[in-house]
């Protein structure tokens, strides 16, 4: 099973894909588009520092290949689980919000009174 974030350089941006995109959404609030997250070269140091703070293995494929392996301290899998949970909760909140937007004012008042 995969245990490292793979970061690919493409011009003036870096990209991560699939599960790694969820991790980046969780750590940096970057938007996921088509299972991909991109960030500018200027954010590279911030990204690497955050991955190291969270002891997440990574591989950077850019001008040169850079690898960081935290061995048994690696938290890739745990952070991925948290990332997927966060995504699931936010998607559920979007569904709820969509339903709330369709309610009449009176129905909204009832919902709010129940929640309070």
What do these predicted ranges mean?
Residues 1-116:
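Basic, polar low-complexity surface loops/patches
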């Amino acid at each position: 099973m995969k245990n490292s974030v793979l970061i690919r350089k493409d011009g003036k941006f870096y990209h991560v894909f699939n599960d790694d995109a969820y991790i980046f959404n969780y750590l940096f609030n970057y938007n996921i588009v088509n299972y991909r997250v991109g960030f500018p070269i200027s954010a590279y140091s911030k990204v690497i520092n955050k991955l190291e703070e969270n002891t997440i293995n990574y591989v950077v494929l850019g001008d040169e290949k850079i690898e960081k392996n935290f061995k048994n301290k690696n938290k890739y899998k745990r952070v991925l689980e948290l990332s997927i949970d966060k995504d699931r909760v936010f998607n559920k909140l979007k569904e709820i919000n969509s339903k709330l937007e369709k309610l009449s004012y009176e129905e909204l008042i009832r919902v709010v009174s129940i929640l309070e």
